[in-house]
């Protein structure tokens, strides 16, 4: 796999989702990543640290530049816990849990997050404002309600199916109510 092409395609997908999700500075963005799927394999079967590092490093750089906080979801072997910066966990009052990811328990994305983040910690759950799912990892449990599906500009990254979610406030009040404009569904 050409890692330069992978990086550029991941960047294109990410920037599309960041723009259309209307995520703001200081908000949380969740990444679910199966490097096995990116390489054309079955989720959890052929994890690649190299692929995880390329994707996570890129996403962390792009989001950090915009002041958006990245949380990287792990696999079911660690109950889909998330890696993020300790300062973000404190800011959002998230309970830190004790687990260290490995290639087959947490995955390559989490290992990369531990490598590239300044003070990485694990938390059990978040309510992110938006997220990107590379390889059908099921990020929905970590995106706040009301979730709005976004179809990425490119639906595959390598061999992995790519989906995304944004979120918006609930619309309440019924037929007489009026609402603020929806920045996601312009």
UniProtKB/Swiss-Prot annotation:
Pfam families xrefs: DUF436
Record protein name field = UPF0340 protein SEQ_1951
Under the heading HAMAP family, the entry gives: UPF0340
Q: Which domain of life is it from?
A: Bacteria
Q: Which family does it belong to?
A: Belongs to the UPF0340 family.
């Amino acid at each position: 796999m050409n890692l330069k092409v992978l990086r550029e395609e991941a960047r294109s997908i990410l920037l599309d989702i960041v723009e259309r999700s209307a995520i703001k500075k200081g908000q949380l963005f969740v990444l679910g990543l199966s490097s096995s799927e990116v390489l054309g394999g079955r989720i959890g079967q052929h994890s690649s640290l190299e692929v995880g590092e390329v994707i996570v490093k890129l996403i962390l750089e792009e989001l950090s530049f915009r002041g958006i906080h990245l949380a990287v979801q792990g696999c079911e072997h660690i109950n889909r816990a998330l890696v993020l910066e300790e300062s973000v966990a404190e800011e959002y009052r998230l309970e830190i849990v004790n687990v260290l990811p490995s290639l087959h328990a947490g995955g390559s994305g989490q290992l990369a997050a531990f490598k590239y983040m300044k003070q990485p910690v694990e938390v059990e759950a978040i309510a992110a404002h938006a997220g990107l799912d590379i390889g059908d990892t099921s990020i929905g449990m970590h995106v706040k309600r009301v979730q709005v599906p976004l179809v990425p500009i490119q639906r595959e990254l390598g061999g992995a199916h790519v989906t995304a979610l944004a979120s918006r406030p609930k619309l309440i009040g019924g037929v007489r109510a009026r609402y603020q404009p929806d920045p996601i569904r312009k």
